[in-house]
Design a protein with these regions (language model features):
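Conserved Nudix-box catalytic region and its N-terminal flanking loop in Nudix hydrolases
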Residues: 44-87
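Nudix hydrolase/Nudix homology domain
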Residues: 3-10, 58-59, 128-172
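Short, well-ordered beta-strand micro-motif
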Residues: 42, 119-123, 140
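Active-site-adjacent beta-strand/loop module that shapes the phosphate/pyrophosphate-binding cleft
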Residues: 100-128
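A short coil-to-beta-strand element that immediately follows conserved catalytic motifs
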Residues: 88-97
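Acidic, metal-coordinating catalytic segment for phosphate/diphosphate chemistry
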Residues: 6-39, 110
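Short connector loops at helix/strand junctions that flank enzyme active sites
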Residues: 35, 55-57, 62, 89, ...
Length: 172
């Protein structure tokens, strides 16, 4: 279940799994952690974008997740793409840095994370698409079809920034 309250910008994603996303919701719980995360826009040679359907909130997304101790940003990005999709990529650019304190994700263990994600561009190297415990579907999607996919606004913003071919990374 998800949606916006009529006439408002509040966005809340509720799923039958362990995560609730809040965006611009005054009733959202207060963040108690910030976890550095990466997300990656990986286009193929036809400019289609690699998307996954997340198992934790059922929404479509670009691959990504939290960094692990000892990892560089590049290593975390490559690992997340490979783990969630089966695709190998090389990191070639920066879309932006996203740190909206009005976007939090509440987990059933009591953790409430404030968004902090570095969104990168990945060049497809190889591999075959496959699902994982974090992705129930994996596919390359033409940019013209992306508006028809249920994507959280924070992820849609990143995809749009990539598609705009911005000359400077987004910082916000």
């Amino acid at each position: 279940m998800s949606g916006r309250s009529p006439g408002s910008s509040i966005w809340k994603v509720v799923s039958d799994v362990a995560r609730i996303d809040y965006l611009d919701d005054p009733a959202a719980p207060e963040a108690n952690s910030i976890v550095p995360a990466v997300s990656v826009v990986v286009p193929d040679d036809q400019r289609r974008i690699l998307l996954i359907r997340r198992t934790d909130n059922k929404y479509w997304s670009i691959p990504g997740g939290g960094m692990e101790p000892g990892e560089s940003i590049r290593e975390a990005a490559g690992r997340e793409v490979k783990e969630e999709t089966g695709i190998d990529c090389d990191i070639t650019g920066l879309v932006g840095i996203y740190s909206n304190p009005r976007h939090v994700a509440a987990y059933d263990d009591g953790e409430v994370r404030q968004e902090f994600s570095i969104c990168l561009v990945g060049r497809l190297l190889g591999g075959s698409t496959r699902t994982s415990n974090e992705s129930s579907e994996v596919r390359f999607v033409p940019p013209a079809d992306i508006p028809g996919y249920e994507i959280h606004p924070s992820i849609r913003l990143r995809i749009n920034h990539y598609l705009e071919r911005r000359t400077t990374p987004y910082i916000g």
